[in-house]
């Protein structure tokens, strides 16, 4: 374990004494540090009748148990304090450590012994070995009453709301869109879990088209065959325009009622939301248009879908109506809401956070967009190519639409609406232009970057450098598209497409508590986060604050060599079938230099801290009238590295409230690996200038082009080896072209440029 503490805010002596007193601690500045520590321990051991037994079970040093120490005239020293503090946090002397000073240095222990008041205050804010902060662990065990009222400590709301007394209800928000064309505003189901509280509370909203269930069978049937050739496109200039959606006004009258009539049963939830509920934040789960128990079509990422989610925020602020059921006869207002909202969730859920932020809707104070898409084109396409998300060959937009159109899971809805839905889906297939892979109006209408100037909320991103599903380009582009005055924070980790709120190494959920307590509850606090919090790839459990993602002025340039080298596209039938059957086999052989490729290796002569997108400048020609170029850059030598999928450290040990929704403690393993993909990228040679320009590829005519690979942050050391592989067809991401052509690369006039921080 290594501490990386971002949620803690230094406080004045007056504030510390006051907050400690509110918790029942009577720390006296006139007492000795030893006396104050003794009182502190007696207080936190409230579950025990015989506190002396516990003290006798702990040690003060390698020769003295803690009870004996307090009964002696020995002074409290730095070594004794650290030994006791570590035991309070769940570490075991003689098991986890022998040398306490060395161990504190090893785990980057955040407390510096000196001021016992500040030390004990910070100790309560420090994470235990099992993930909860000490104060959260104590509260979960009943340290203070479950009062259904707010109680703050170090700027964070404590779990003083009963999750068992929470109000669970369902309402149906009247949206301002009519996506199924029936002349009525689409109703959207909202599942609510909110604290039992006499006043008003804020909400964390998760906009998830998956929440009401998914139609996996229909989605699987809609997958595309990737074993097709790359198309030769007609040269043209693509034009797009900014469009707006049609909205519909509220219809009819309804009587006003005070209580919802539909009770919410068990639902799947997000553990960050679970953590926030007993701290006084209502949880809202919204599936949106086209989903089970809601109305409308699944418009998949456009601003009609986003408008319906936005209308839920409007309802929380009194600007839209909600009904108790589909009859629309009884209206219910969100009188419990203080109007302030944060959004949460990963992938499609984080995508909707991005989209919602670009509406500038009043009441949306914070988005927590985890691995969210910023432009749908960049999810299913790349530089004029059809590209499948990592791990999902053959998926395209209509298979996602089929997956999330869960209205068809209700047989009656299927009978009434499936014919119209199939016609809608047929039109979507045409609009995708899968044959060309080109950008067009369909994709432009699902590009949130062009509306980023409207963002008013504070923005938190999380994203993984090894996320080849929603690639790092999405967060990089959104991060830089935001207006300069918007506060933004990026947690850039080394995982894949994963959550980070239950990781041992980073106090992410506590940081979100501090931010939302400040922004949604109005609690006065000096809490702030740096622009970028980056997980250091060179060692286990180490995070660093950075000023920016990209925007580096310095580049390291690597020339590709001399002469010309050739990349053949067509494989033997045997190899083609092997690779098409398992893209992982292809990847393994690609990295080992065994496929049809150009392989270049460099040994670094100095440390290199990459920050931003790598740039490839190539001079090449194709033997035919089309072609694609693929590139991957690897950290290529056997070493210990962070692996991309979190592993389980301890099951169900993090209490999100008070005996409520236990979460697993997870972390990225630091393990021996043969190599690591740093970045990758793909380009259709007919789109070598830009997305809106489709050009002719003249056979055997040299072309000069440059394109950026996926942005990343990655630390390399002197002596490390870089491997660049250039090839054509990628059996995981691109169409699997069988055309018998080759690319010739002019090595002398081609180069790789890596942006880096100054050393």
From Swiss-Prot:
Active site annotation, chain numbering: 347, 467, 497
Primary residence: cytoplasm
Keyword Cell membrane: no
InterPro entries, per database record: AB_hydrolase_fold, Galactose-bd-like_sf, Pept_S15_Xpro, PepX_N_dom, PepX_N_dom_sf, Xaa-Pro-like_dom, Xaa-Pro_dipept_C, Xaa-Pro_dipeptidyl-ppase/CocE
Keywords: Aminopeptidase, Cytoplasm, Hydrolase, Protease, Serine protease
Signal sequence range: none
GO cellular component terms listed in the entry, alphabetical order: cytoplasm
Highest taxon in the source lineage: Bacteria
GO biological process: proteolysis
Enzyme class: hydrolase
Pfam families found in the cross-reference section: Peptidase_S15, PepX_C, PepX_N
Subcellular location: Cytoplasm
Keyword Protease (UniProt): yes
GO MF assignments: aminopeptidase activity; dipeptidyl-peptidase activity; serine-type peptidase activity
Enzyme Commission number(s) of this protein: 3.4.14.11
Catalysed reactions, as listed in the record: Hydrolyzes Xaa-Pro-|- bonds to release unblocked, N-terminal dipeptides from substrates including Ala-Pro-|-p-nitroanilide and (sequentially) Tyr-Pro-|-Phe-Pro-|-Gly-Pro-|-Ile
Family: Belongs to the peptidase S15 family.
Summary of subunit composition and partner proteins: Homodimer.
Xref: HAMAP family: Aminopeptidase_S15 (MF_00698)
Protein's job: Removes N-terminal dipeptides sequentially from polypeptides having unsubstituted N-termini provided that the penultimate residue is proline.
Protein name per UniProt: Xaa-Pro dipeptidyl-peptidase
UniProt gene name: pepX
């Amino acid at each position: 374990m290594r501490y990386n503490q971002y949620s803690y805010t230094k406080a004045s002596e007056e504030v510390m004494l006051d907050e400690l007193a509110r918790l029942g601690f009577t720390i006296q500045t006139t007492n000795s540090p030893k006396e104050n520590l003794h009182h502190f321990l007696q207080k936190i051991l409230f579950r025990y009748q015989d506190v002396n037994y516990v003290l006798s079970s702990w040690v003060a040093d390698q020769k003295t148990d803690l009870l004996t120490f307090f009964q002696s005239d020995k002074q409290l020293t730095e070594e004794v304090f650290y030994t006791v503090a570590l035991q309070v946090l769940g570490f075991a002397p003689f098991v986890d450590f022998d040398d306490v000073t060395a161990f504190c240095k090893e785990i980057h222990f955040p407390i510096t012994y000196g001021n016992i008041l500040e030390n004990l205050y910070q100790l309560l804010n420090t994470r235990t070995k099992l993930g909860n902060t000490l104060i959260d662990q104590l509260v979960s065990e009943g340290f203070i009453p479950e009062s259904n009222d707010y109680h703050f400590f170090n700027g964070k709301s404590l779990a003083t709301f009963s999750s068992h007394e929470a109000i669970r209800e369902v309402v149906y928000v009247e949206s301002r869109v009519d996506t199924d064309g029936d002349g009525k505003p689409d109703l959207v189901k909202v599942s609510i879990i909110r604290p039992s509280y006499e006043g008003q509370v804020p909400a964390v909203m998760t906009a998830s088209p998956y929440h009401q269930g998914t139609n996996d069978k229909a989605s699987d049937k809609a997958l595309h065959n990737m074993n097709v050739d790359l198309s030769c496109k007609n040269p043209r200039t693509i034009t797009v325009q900014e469009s707006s959606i049609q909205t519909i006004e509220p219809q009819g009258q309804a009587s006003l009622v005070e209580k919802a009539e539909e009770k919410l049963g068990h639902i799947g939830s997000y553990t960050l939301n679970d953590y926030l509920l007993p701290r006084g934040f209502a949880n809202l789960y919204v599936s949106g248009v086209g989903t089970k128990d809601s109305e409308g079509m699944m418009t998949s990422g456009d601003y009609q879908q986003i408008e319906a989610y936005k209308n839920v925020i409007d309802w929380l602020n009194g600007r839209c109506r909600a009904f108790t059921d589909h009859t629309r006869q009884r209206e219910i207002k969100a009188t419990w809401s203080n109007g302030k909202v944060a959004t949460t969730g990963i992938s499609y859920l984080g995508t909707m956070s991005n989209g919602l932020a670009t509406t500038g809707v009043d009441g949306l104070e914070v988005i927590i967009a985890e691995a969210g898409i910023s432009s749908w084109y960049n999810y299913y396409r790349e530089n004029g190519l059809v590209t499948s998300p990592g791990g999902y060959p053959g998926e395209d937009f209509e298979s996602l639409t089929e997956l999330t159109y869960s209205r068809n899971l209700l047989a009656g809805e299927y009978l009434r609406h499936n014919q119209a839905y199939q016609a809608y889906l047929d039109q979507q297939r045409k609009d995708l232009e899968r044959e060309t892979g080109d950008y067009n109006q369909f994709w432009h209408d699902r590009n949130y970057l062009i509306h980023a100037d409207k963002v008013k909320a504070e923005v938190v991103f999380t994203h993984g450098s090894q996320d080849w599903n929603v690639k790092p380009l999405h967060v990089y582009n959104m991060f830089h598209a935001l207006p300069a005055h918007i506060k933004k924070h990026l947690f850039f980790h080394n995982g894949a497409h994963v959550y980070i709120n239950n990781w041992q190494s980073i106090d992410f959920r506590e940081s979100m508590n501090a931010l939302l307590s400040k922004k949604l509850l109005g609690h006065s606090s000096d809490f702030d986060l740096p622009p970028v919090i980056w997980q250091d790839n060179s060692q286990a459990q180490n995070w660093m604050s950075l000023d920016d993602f990209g925007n580096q002025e310095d580049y390291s340039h690597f020339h590709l060599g001399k002469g010309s080298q050739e990349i053949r596209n067509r494989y033997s039938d045997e190899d083609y079938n092997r690779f098409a059957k398992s893209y992982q086999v292809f990847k393994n052989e690609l990295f080992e230099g065994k496929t049809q490729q150009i392989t270049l290796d460099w040994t670094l002569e100095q440390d290199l801290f990459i920050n931003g997108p790598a740039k490839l400048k190539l001079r090449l020609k194709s033997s035919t009238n089309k072609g694609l170029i693929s590139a991957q850059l690897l950290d290529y030598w056997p070493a210990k590295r962070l692996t991309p999928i979190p592993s389980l450290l301890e099951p169900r040990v993090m209490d999100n409230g008070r005996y409520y929704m236990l979460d697993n403690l997870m972390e990225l393993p630091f393990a021996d690996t043969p190599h690591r993909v740093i970045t990758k990228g793909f380009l259709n040679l007919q789109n070598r200038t830009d997305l809106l320009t489709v050009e002719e590829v003249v056979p055997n005519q040299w072309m000069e082009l440059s394109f950026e690979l996926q942005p990343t942050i990655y630390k390399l050391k002197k002596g490390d080896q870089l491997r660049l592989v250039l090839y054509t067809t990628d059996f995981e991401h691109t169409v699997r072209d069988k055309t018998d052509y080759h690319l010739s690369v002019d090595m002398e006039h081609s180069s790789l440029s890596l942006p880096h921080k100054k050393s």
